[in-house]
Amino acid sequence: MNQAQNSVGKSLDVQSFINQQPLSRYQWRVVLLCFLIVFLDGLDTAAMGFIAPALSQEWGIDRASLGPVMSAALIGMVFGALGSGPLADRFGRKGVLVGAVLVFGGFSLASAYATNVDQLLVLRFLTGLGLGAGMPNATTLLSEYTPERLKSLLVTSMFCGFNLGMAGGGFISAKMIPAYGWHSLLVIGGVLPLLLALVLMVWLPESARFLVVRNRGTDKIRKTLSPIAPQVVAEAGSFSVPEQKAVAARSVFAVIFSGTYGLGTMLLWLTYFMGLVIVYLLTSWLPTLMRDSGASMEQAAFIGALFQFGGVLSAVGVGWAMDRYNPHKVIGIFYLLAGVFAYAVGQSLGNITVLATLVLIAGMCVNGAQSAMPSLAARFYPTQGRATGVSWMLGIGRFGAILGAWSGATLLGLGWNFEQVLTALLVPAALATVGVIVKGLVSHADAT
């Protein structure tokens, strides 16, 4: 009998139980639902970058006027992420996730009917509240349903959904906007999440580890875990999470800022912040930079989509490598290469084929690294503070996204050209590399 398969009346260690079982259809369902949440999160997050050229032309506004609108959703994401983590650690992952999807779906749909910049700015901020809450809590829930041997692989695979959603926004906009206008992308990005929220209400389970830590009742925990291995769960008299003893009765903020976790938290924030500077400068402004350099609207949207699609190609490989090698070194290498290839993109404007290839590779590097960071954070923090730790990393990181979107508008306003803007990305790439490598050297905890 396996260690987790205790005799009747004995306590069942939830994580050991999950580790020892083959991945069930029930767990694959959690993977799929979290993937869909993150996919639609990515589609709505990237929407402004893709509709900006058409919106600017229709409303007769310059690029600088769109800077605050592009940043509005990112500011909302900060508040959504920072607020949702503590809520999920107190009340549960599922309810927060369903609410997040309803919020970003509803306000994305409303954004399609905005008639001026002020309306769009407010609606994009409100959309951002839901977007900011969705991703970290999907990461937390999925990480708590996955065995250690597959944790990084499955979480980074889920994050393929974010990059695929952003890329999908580019491909959809290339076809839909010329035919139906900029509103069409926002309508799609609003209706689909509202439909998904209905599915989540029925099919998404609560985290069993959360139920144990919060003492939500043996029968409820048993019902939640039974689909994985009914006989093993039926034999258990109670359920436990061993880490609970080490951090019990402490607030979530005391956990993530304690001596054990404090420095690691700061380094996670630095790394994710710098990575998002790169991602959002390119996501928000690469199509516009391409248009300014003579590319057609279709070419600009396609190359912008390639940047996101690169993350889809690399995320699974990064997760696989993290489960087998030093995860900090794996991520650090990808950030370093992101800076190198972003610089190369800036040197290749004259050849559209070479440019597209380099954009794809740059996207593979930086988006692959970014997709891996939530998995790294989820492995680092204990259950009591996991949602807060992951969501605060993503929330603080959003300031990097705001800086990236804002700096693109500022640099273009100062007259910087395509090559100069791309060269500047060497700085955040270097800082992200240093941040994650140093975290690997100083971390002494790997709470799972």
From Swiss-Prot:
User: Periplasmic compartment: which residues?
Assistant: 52-67, 116-119, 174-184, 283-301, 351, 420-421
Sequence intervals crossing the membrane:
31-51, 68-88, 95-115, 120-140, 153-173, 185-205, 262-282, 302-322, 330-350, 352-372, 399-419, 422-442
Listed result of changing residue 92 to A: Decrease in 4-HBA transport and chemotaxis
Superkingdom of the source species: Bacteria
What does changing residue 44 to E do?
A: Decrease in 4-HBA transport
Q: What is the effect of changing residue 92 to Q?
A: Decrease in 4-HBA transport and strong decrease in chemotaxis
Work out whether the entry's keyword set contains Ribonucleoprotein.
no
Q: Quote a single Gene Ontology cellular component term.
A: plasma membrane
Q: Per UniProt, what does mutating residue 323 to N do?
A: Abolishes 4-HBA transport and chemotaxis
Family annotation (Pfam families):
MFS_1
Show the InterPro entries listed in the entry: MFS (IPR011701), MFS_AAHS (IPR004746), MFS_dom (IPR020846), MFS_trans_sf (IPR036259), Sugar_transporter_CS (IPR005829)
UniProt xrefs under CDD domains: MFS_PcaK_like
What is the membrane topology here?
Multi-pass membrane protein
Q: Does the keyword Cell wall biogenesis/degradation apply?
A: no
Any one GO biological process: chemotaxis
Consequence of changing residue 328 to R: Decrease in 4-HBA transport and loss of chemotaxis
Q: Where in the cell is it found?
A: Cell inner membrane
What changing residue 41 to A/N does, per the record, is:
Abolishes 4-HBA transport
Note what the entry says on domains.
Amino acids located between the second and third, and the eighth and ninth transmembrane regions are required for substrate transport.
Primary role: Transports 4-hydroxybenzoate (4-HBA) and protocatechuate across the membrane. Driven by the proton motive force. Also functions as a chemoreceptor, which is required for chemotaxis to aromatic acids.
Read off the NCBIfam families from this record: 2A0115
Indicate the family of this protein. Answer: Belongs to the major facilitator superfamily. Aromatic acid:H(+) symporter (AAHS) (TC 2.A.1.15) family.
Its protein name is 4-hydroxybenzoate transporter PcaK
* Organism of origin: Pseudomonas putida
User: Which gene name belongs to this protein?
Assistant: pcaK
